[in-house]
UniProtKB/Swiss-Prot annotation:
BP term (GO), one: bacterial-type flagellum-dependent cell motility
UniProt similarity note: Belongs to the FlgH family.
GO CC terms: bacterial-type flagellum basal body, distal rod, L ring; cell outer membrane
Protein name as catalogued: Flagellar L-ring protein
Length: 244
């Protein structure tokens, strides 16, 4: 009865510890920082204050809808469309073999007396008898063989509209975009940030994700369906603390 009470007490303490302990302490939770990289923060912003010259008698000014030029994102808070097409394939194989063997004998040296003194001969003979031992090392053989293989294939295809956060002095833009879609209580979140060149923006104001430097893309889902793909905190904690 006492052992049962102690066991229940320890189980209760373990459950309480797991419930109160932060979940991220047991398992690694992937996270992405979408803030601008340090080199973007350190770089000077470009001067976008371009004065508009008066055009006396002209029917077409340099407004937001120019007649003979493409309307592309050029300044902070302009919007730009990002076409995300990311494919990742990985194949990894490893094999390791190890064979080792050891053993041997050690024989001590003997003393030889070439004189005629019988007493000395007797002493040398006794010394040789006392040292007449062979040191033998036990034979040892070890073998190890291991290997592993991993194959992964992932794809993400989506479209998102991002905002220019900062225009750098080298004609590149730091962008950030976020989109949330709620369907039947399941929230899907797509977030992106990175640096694009003005030359990579098409005439339709579109950039492919492969042209984004320091690209950070996250696609997550929150809701009852996605919760079934994650372990519960108690199960996760017990597995993390299990020593075997």
């Amino acid at each position: 009865m006492l052992i049962k009470s102690i066991g229940m007490y320890l189980i209760g303490i373990l459950i309480l510890f797991i419930a109160l302990y932060p979940r991220h302490s047991f398992a690694f939770e992937p996270n992405i920082d979408f803030n601008a990289p340090d080199w973007v923060e350190e770089r000077e912003s470009a001067d976008n204050d371009i004065p508009e010259l008066p055009r006396a008698g002209s029917l077409f000014g340099s407004g937001d809808k120019p007649l003979f030029s493409d309307r592309r994102a050029m300044k902070p808070d302009d919007l730009i469309t990002i076409v995300i097409s990311e494919n990742a394939n990985a194949n990894f194989t490893t094999n390791k073999n190890y064979n080792g063997a050891s053993g041997g004998n050690v024989t001590p040296p003997s003393i030889e007396y070439t004189g005629n003194n019988e007493e000395q001969k007797q002493i040398v003979s006794e010394l040789n008898d006392q040292a007449a031992y062979n040191l033998t090392k036990a034979n040892n053989t070890s073998n190890f063989q291991g290997g592993g293989a991993q194959t992964r294939s992932e794809a993400l295809n989506a479209t998102i509209t991002a905002r220019i956060v900062k225009v750098l002095d080298n004609n590149t833009y730091f962008i950030h975009g976020r989109r949330e879609v709620l369907v039947d209580g399941e929230k899907q979140i797509l977030e992106l940030s990175g640096v694009v060149r003005s030359f990579d923006i098409s005439k339709d104001n579109v950039v492919q994700s492969k042209h984004i430097a320091n690209a950070k893309i996250a696609y997550t889902s929150l809701g009852p369906i996605s919760d079934t793909n994650h372990k519960k905190p108690v199960s996760d904690g017990i597995e993390s603390l299990y020593p075997f």
